[in-house]
Amino acid sequence: MKPKVESYIYKSMSDIFINRIKCTKETIVEILDLFTLKSFVLEISNVQRSDVLYEKIKQFNLRYTTSLEDKSPYFDVALMSNKEQFKEIIDYIVDSDSETFAIINMGNRIQWEQFLYNKIPVRKLIKQGIIDINISVGLQESSISISLCNNIYNSKQIVTDIKTLFRDRRC
């Protein structure tokens, strides 16, 4: 079955949905490479304390914060990353029990640690100019959703580039 790409282009922002896709390291990196992101917030859900992923985050010396609650074996992790660091850690994310992760490009990197506790909807954050892109990957759902600011990205070109990536693939 071929991946399905849907796009909804609005005045100030766009939503792009990619379904029926294998969320492999290669696929995710190819999509990430469509954007010029220097550093970004990487939010990973449902990380276990004993997981290799958590150990690697600490080993790679990445700046991170958690939603750690004493009694829960699972927590969310937000960390500041760049593409090279992401390429090192993506294998551990895909192999972990994490169900979803998101890549968020924020204008004000000083406040990145607050992102984990910020429950404002992504669309509102884009409209307010706080973030310019959010790429959410549902590992178990085999889906990727991208919300982006039209003032910064050419959404029609991004959709064309995504369709070109998957034109001859069966996932």
For every predicted segment, state its role.
Residues 1-171:
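Structured alpha/beta or helical-core interaction and ligand-binding surfaces enriched in interleaved
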